[in-house]
Amino acid sequence: MIQKPRGTRDFLPAEMAQRRFVEQKMRAVAATFGYGEIVTPMFEELELFTIKSGEGIINEMYAFEDKGGRKITLRPEITAAVLRAYVNEAQMAPKPLRWFYFAECFRYERPQKGRYRQFWQFGSELIGADSAAADAEVISLAYELLRCTGVRFVMKVGHLAPMKHLLSGLDAPSQKQVMAALDKRDMDLLGTTLASLDSSDLFEPLKGLVTAKTLPEIFAVTGDIPEKARIEETFGYLEAQNIPFEQNFGIARGLDYYTGMVFEGFADNLGAENQILGGGVYRLAHLFGGKDVPSCGFGIGFDRVLVSLGEITPQTIPVVAVICTPETRIPAYNAASALRSAGITAVMDLLDRGFGAQLSSALKSGASFAVVIGEKEAAAGMITLKDLATAVQTEMSIDNAIEVIHGSCR
């Protein structure tokens, strides 16, 4: 028996209904912020992703040579592809550009709960706006996207300027060692790492960044850095919009990727692997042949959000089983067409079973109503509507049946 590839999944209709339910909620929120959808190719030139991250990332990607000898990869993330599309297609468009995406990505990594080799991201990119208001808008959008799903989460917001200020005396490899320790929130490891770099004097200031609860505490450590006003303004805008967040100036990922504000989101119930959101301010367009442009964006791990949510009950439209005999199939087709035109799901029996078997099948399928058309109903141009929850049935016209079915949803 041929099995699906490791790290992938099949989604049957019930699960797809749940996924689409959450996806549509998120799409609706993005639209209210004025963001339009962008779609990029599922595969891109390999260089698009190695130009910033280096050749080492190849081991994490589905990379290959095509028949023309071109180095291609299935996309491991979306941001680089969106900025490539911007450089190719939209550099002259009026700014700022507000784009969102919902797309599948591929990474060759060890599958585990909530992490797969084929996975979906929902995210946005705001291109061409460099201001505290822009930073706050993107964070607000990320917050509302998560909130609308019903997931329980904590948003953490910081800025890389204080960290970069403290680490400015270290070379790039040393900075990465320190960042690795900070990322693990391991103060013992941080102390050991700094000692090995003859930089133990940085331990207390760095610890202060990680543990500080207020902006005055941060600037007591760093002094009046140039980015102070921008940080205060961004936080002020978030507070004015009643966006709940925790400040975290110890966010250690992406020091060589992000250039300013950074933020993350964590689900309450996913244990150690609980990050479901990551984003910040960056500049990538110039790497892909375009003019330098400020950008800010984020990605949401859609699959991990679904794992956190657990069972979801999508709002469903009524399902009606249309029950007929072989002799009344034509009027049954007409009734089914009328139901579907009214936005009601209508399912017909295809096996020429008796009324009893059809009714039993309808009950097992979860249908809300049955529209029964026997010879008597067909001769009178009527139908019998049966409420499968109460077993009450009434003869009526199909138009009246549609009104009753719609009324049951109110």
UniProtKB/Swiss-Prot annotation:
SUPFAM superfamilies in UniProt: Class II aaRS ABD-related, Class II aaRS and biotin synthetases
Domain of life: Archaea
Family, as annotated: Belongs to the class-II aminoacyl-tRNA synthetase family.
Name of the protein in question: Histidine--tRNA ligase
Catalytic activity entry: tRNA(His) + L-histidine + ATP = L-histidyl-tRNA(His) + AMP + diphosphate + H(+)
EC annotation from Swiss-Prot or TrEMBL: 6.1.1.21
NCBIfam families cross-referenced by the UniProt entry: hisS (TIGR00442)
One BP annotation, GO: histidyl-tRNA aminoacylation
Chain's gene name: hisS
PROSITE patterns the UniProt entry points to: AA_TRNA_LIGASE_II
Keywords attached to this entry: Aminoacyl-tRNA synthetase, ATP-binding, Cytoplasm, Ligase, Nucleotide-binding, Protein biosynthesis
One Pfam family hit: tRNA-synt_His
GO molecular function, one term: ATP binding
Gene Ontology CC, one term: cytoplasm
Subcellular location, principal: cytoplasm
